[in-house]
């Protein structure tokens, strides 16, 4: 019964963490752009929570291998992916 709320809370937490990456000027622009795209996917209410999470995970996994990514940003992205992997319909 409380599953939809839990999913939305997880998505909201992921968006907050991604927003920190977007606002961090020490993170390369392409990585901040990918984080912005992931946020946009997570906020698309036309899709189910699991689909939104899967779309964002795809974007974040692609960018997480970037050799120019600072370590703190990579760890944050891994944390976001871990949160989003628990979102189920």
UniProtKB/Swiss-Prot annotation:
Which residues form each disulfide bond in the chain?
none
A Pfam family of this chain: UPF0147
Record-linked Gene3D superfamilies: Ta0600-like (1.20.1440.50)
Q: Which InterPro entries match?
A: Ta0600-like_sf, UPF0147
User: Per the similarity annotation, which family is this?
Assistant: Belongs to the UPF0147 family.
* NCBIfam families xrefs: PRK04330.1 (NF003319)
Report what the protein is called: UPF0147 protein SSO6503
> Which source organism does the UniProt entry give?
Saccharolobus solfataricus (strain ATCC 35092 / DSM 1617 / JCM 11322 / P2)
